């Protein structure tokens, strides 16, 4: 699977994540509320909650914070009713973009997302305009460390049911089907591995190469979207220039 670098900016992205950790914890807290309302507070019987907890741990959310969020969600009988919406559209140079939101006010969210698109030369589209360009996949990203053998890790992941294993720059990336994500993640967790990322994502079927000028404009659009409290995930098919940094 060469021809594009999906993981080249993981470390730069991780630095930004560190700077925005409080906002990320708030967003994950909203996901916990939705998961608990749908399937209850027990991770043993609630697969969606297990997935959110894995995402929380990959983002270094402390265990006591996770537990408090679950208790708070299970105790709030009149908790805010969040609606899940996915907006679709095009960034600069026709980049395909999906934006997942969890919101208690869809008019506010729609306006904010539309503004982010149009400000940088993109535009929101109708439902289905770009979603066919993506597949739902489980993705687990593991930092390369001394003592972590690549071949052993690859066999571990593939034996557990992973579809693909890649080694790139400073990380290993494991891709799974949506259905097998939990099984593979738990198998790797059982080996004591820690993750930089562990979640189900919309992965593009193909990537669109962009130049530095477009990358700069598109990054501004991504920053506005990711800074919005209602936006949970942003997926796109842009291939950033080699060596380009945010």
From Swiss-Prot:
| Annotated Pfam families | TACO1_YebC_N (PF20772), Transcrip_reg (PF01709)
Naming one, the record's GO cellular component terms include: cytosol
Which keywords belong to this entry?
A: Cytoplasm, DNA-binding, Transcription, Transcription regulation
**Where does it reside?**
Cytoplasm
Q: Would you say which domain of life the source belongs to?
A: Bacteria
Query: What are the BP-aspect GO terms?
Result: regulation of DNA-templated transcription
Q: Which GO terms describe its molecular function?
A: DNA binding
Question: What does the similarity note say?
Answer: Belongs to the TACO1 family.
Q: What is this protein called?
A: Probable transcriptional regulatory protein CBO3073/CLC_2975
Organism, as annotated = Clostridium botulinum (strain Hall / ATCC 3502 / NCTC 13319 / Type A)
Which classification does the entry list for the species? Bacteria, Bacillati, Bacillota, Clostridia, Eubacteriales
């Amino acid at each position: 699977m060469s021809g594009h670098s999906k993981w080249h900016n993981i470390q730069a992205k991780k630095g930004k994540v560190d700077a925005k950790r409080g906002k990320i914890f708030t967003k994950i807290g909203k996901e916990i509320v939705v998961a608990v309302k749908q399937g209850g507070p027990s991770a043993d019987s609630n697969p969606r909650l297990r997935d959110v907890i894995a995402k929380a741990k990959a983002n270094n959310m402390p265990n006591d914070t996770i537990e408090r969020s679950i208790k708070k969600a299970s105790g709030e009988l009149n908790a805010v009713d969040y609606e899940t919406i996915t907006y679709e559209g095009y960034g600069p140079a026709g980049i395909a973009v999906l934006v997942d939101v969890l919101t208690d006010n869809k008019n506010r969210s729609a306006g904010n997302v539309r503004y982010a698109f149009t400000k940088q030369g993109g535009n929101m589209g109708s439902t289905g305009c770009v979603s066919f360009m993506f597949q739902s996949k489980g993705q687990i990203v593991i930092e390369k460390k001394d003592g972590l053998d690549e071949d052993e890790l690859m066999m571990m992941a593939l034996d557990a049911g992973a579809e693909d294993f890649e080694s790139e720059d400073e990380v290993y990336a494991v891709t799974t089907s949506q259905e097998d994500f939990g099984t593979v993640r738990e198998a790797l967790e059982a080996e004591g591995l820690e993750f930089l990322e562990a979640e189900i994502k919309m992965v593009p079927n193909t990537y669109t190469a962009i130049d530095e000028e477009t990358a700069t404009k598109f990054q501004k659009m991504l920053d506005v979207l990711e800074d919005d409290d209602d936006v949970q995930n942003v997926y796109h098919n842009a291939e950033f220039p080699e060596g380009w940094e945010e």
